[in-house]
Amino acid sequence: MNSNPFSDTTIRKIERFQWWHQRRTKLIFIILIILTILIISLSLILKFVILKPSKSKITTTTTTTTTTTTTTTTSYQQYVWRDTGNLVNARYRHAASVLNDGRVLITGGLGSTYQLRTAELYDPSAGNWTLTGNMNIEREFHTSSTLTNGKVLVVGGEASRGYQNTAELYDPSTGVWTVTDSLEYARSEHAATVLLDGKILITGGYNGRDYLDSAELFDISTETWRNTTSMNSGREHHTASLLQDGRVLVVGGSDSRTAELYDPLTEAWKYTGNMTIGRQSHTATVLANGKVLVVGGSHDPTSRAELYDPTTETWTVINGPKDIRFDHTASVLTNGQVLIAGGYAVDDLITTELYDPSTGNWIITGNMSHTRTDHIAATLLNGNVLVAGGYDRGAKNTAELYEPL
């Protein structure tokens, strides 16, 4: 007699249930293992690929000749460029100054067909541009300097009525421009340097006939100009950099490879070694260690860069950026690196590169959204770099931000 209380059919159902239950348990266990592997894999991808754009791919190239061996190391990094608000007026050959409150003042430049006297303010907190008061005279190839009292001094340039010796002061608190004392000499494509005592040194430039060697000083307490000692060479499209000891280094211009030092205490100029090539429309950037990095130029277009050491007053050729360029911009980042952006070579450039003074290497970083030359670049108080305007088959009104990681 069968003592099992379940029928054969019921027993088979129970056995099938147990078999499916065991199989389902195994399947669930396998699926959980697969999901765990996928989650770990995705985490690694996010960590090392997507969220680590600053990791560099480094390429080292060694070139040997009978006399020299040059090693060039290039890294590749992706940083963040993003569009910000457009300028109200498209422009190039304009000027920019960072105000004490963090806003950026853009002045003048060349529009689609003529010089501009309009001025605009960029607000980093809102990411937009607004018109402010117009200058009294339209200008391109002028200079713009933020003074120690917070006002902005705009000097010289080229206008429809000719080369300018005029100057204007902008008051950010009122948005009003005021004509101030005029320079003795009209000039454009000159350089302006804010000295340690607050005075403004104007050097060189072009007046339609000659490359100028003259220099003038603006006293903000009296708002007047006076002549200072002239440079040893006439120059335009040169650079003038304030060194840490208060002297001013003037480099290149007018296809020159010469450099001069100005001492504000004695108001004397002296030559200080020659670069290896002539440069104009280049950039010169004072590094945290006090040296000056010179990049690019249009006389002998080259990727070769040079470093000036103020302590020894000597020049050294160093590794250069990948791209030959001039009419570009150079901006010092908060980490001490130098951002080179845009410019012109065979065509207008979209590329950007970083120079790392700690290693002497160049880093190819992400491209801008727009090609541009004759633009401006301003380092904001938050460390970002604003690039605005410029030329690319016409005046541009676009602006973008570089955000270091």
What residue ranges belong to the model's regions?
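Intrinsically disordered cytoplasmic terminal tails of membrane proteins
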Residues: 1-25, 57-67
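Intrinsically disordered, low-complexity regions
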Residues: 3, 8-17, 42, 46-47, ...
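Alpha-helical transmembrane segments in eukaryotic/viral proteins
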Residues: 28-59
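Kelch-like beta-propeller repeat domains
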Residues: 46, 71-405
